[in-house]
């Protein structure tokens, strides 16, 4: 059960924000084999001047960064996460986000750190 936060400039149209969320979810499904219904996302539109990214870090050419933070249970190996990063980036690129503008960070924890609601069972 990942908890995904997507941070984008508030100039991105609402429909496009939801398309980004769809692309991220599809990337998790493709890259990690998660169920498509295992979807918990928060979209944060921010003023463009509140999104800071070095435009040339690691030789990049960043202009309109989309930050994707994924909080998930530690259960995937590095290869699976690499597949997920690639799938998310490809999905966002299909929605018009340049690969240099995709920034994904994963934080992992254990099942003991989650409460999935009163009826949730692991």
Short names for language-model regions:
Residues 1-122:
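Interaction-mediating elements
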